[in-house]
Amino acid sequence: MTTTIIYTGQLRCSATHNQSGTVIETDAPTDNRGKGERFSPTDLLCVSLGTCIITTMGIRAIDMGINLDGTTLQVQKHMLGDPRRVGGIDITLGFPASLQLEEKDRLILQRIGDNCPVQKSIHPDIKTNIVYNWGAVTA
């Protein structure tokens, strides 16, 4: 993966995914002199963990003949200071009530999520709390 990042001023950046041309913009958070109108770089760290968890689970789910469509994730970032950094990430996954899985299949998928590449790349000082709520999402 190659990306091109341009600092556009006023604590904002524009990042282009070179293969697809997709662009995302970042902004500093309001508590650090930004406008808070876009994801902050530390927000993207947390979003990356959440999307990696569900993407890797989705890959295995396809192989297992399981459809995870409609699964939701709530991500909460906890910042620490001195030095300013992410101290914790809470992620709660809500799976559709219509998804009826055996316990062994749930455990397989949870193990995949708990060991996704982003999770394995995060420094151990960052505390992650991942909760899997099976059957939590209703139509």
Label each region the model flagged.
Residues 1-47, 55-139:
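Extended beta-strand/beta-hairpin segments
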